[in-house]
Amino acid sequence: MLVLGIESSCDETGLALYDTERGLLAHALHSQIAMHREYGGVVPELASRDHIRRALPLLEEVLERSGAARGDIDAIAYTQGPGLAGALLVGASIANSLAMAWNKPTIGIHHLEGHLLSPLLVDEPPPFPFVALLVSGGHTQLMRVTDVGVYETLGETLDDAAGEAFDKTAKLLGLGYPGGPEVSRLAEFGTPGAVVLPRPMLHSGDLDFSFSGLKTAVLTHVKKLGGNVCEQAKADLARGFVDAAVEVLAVKSLAALKKTKLKRLVVAGGVGANRQLREALSSAAQKRGFAVHYPDLSLCTDNGAMIALAGALRMQRWPAQATDDYAFTVKPRWDLGSLGA
């Protein structure tokens, strides 16, 4: 079965073709970072308009790369939510319009389920069950993943997501957009231990997170430094922030493995591309004897490949979830725990 995936939940337009026998055939992605940079964040109206411009050229690109023809496609999967309402509507409209023209079924996919399953796109995918650390700009959760559609929330952020804390720290340090990668890059030049920041809820005894206090600690430190902060002071603060965030994420992930008695950890979402986090978890895996799996770096960000994969896996298990009536809704807010099989 060949599935076309369309992702448009925020500021990336992604299309991909996934075959249930041959795997990922091709994926193409357009990022809107350059367009939103001058505003310091995503402008929803601009994001929606750009999705409209980019989707069909990206479709032609994945068809050319894969060698597939439009008639070879068996179904179309699209991101139904959560995300920006206008951006979701663009992707859903394009998916259902193509499906109507080609007489193909469609299936709406939860954006976070796509991230959860994205490590299955590697050459040696992790078998179920596993613990997943889902860490991105809008979400920070630990999940027990028993199978496709069988997800249990073990812990989640009580306030800000880790990615939000990265972005806020970048703004406080006067860094560019997007902030997360900029903070991580600057932290590479920081002196370990020069700035020690709190590790919120590190010893709370549960698997929940909190990053608002860490953001406040960064703000307090910036105010103490005053104006005209030198680059080394910025780098030291960035290093202190990254060290604190990574330690909390790693310690909670290890606790989730211990609680569930599982030996496999999957890391997904944009913050999962962070080098320091990967090194910390990989080091712990070697010492403690568990396996840790990541998607390819190119698939940590939002992408169509994960949507195509999730659509294919769901249609294999539950063909009735696909529809050919081309009536659709989008869900800007959608709890992953309510998804089910």
From Swiss-Prot:
Chemical reaction(s) catalysed: L-threonylcarbamoyladenylate + adenosine(37) in tRNA = N(6)-L-threonylcarbamoyladenosine(37) in tRNA + AMP + H(+)
Cofactor: record remark: Binds 1 Fe(2+) ion per subunit.
Pfam families named among the record's database cross-references: TsaD
The enzyme's E.C. designation: 2.3.1.234
Top enzyme category: transferase
Molecular function via GO: iron ion binding; N(6)-L-threonylcarbamoyladenine synthase activity
NCBIfam families given in the database record: gcp_kae1 (TIGR00329), T6A_TsaD_YgjD (TIGR03723)
Family to which this protein belongs: Belongs to the KAE1 / TsaD family.
Name listed for the protein in its UniProt record: tRNA N6-adenosine threonylcarbamoyltransferase
Species annotation: Paraburkholderia phymatum (strain DSM 17167 / CIP 108236 / LMG 21445 / STM815) (Burkholderia phymatum)
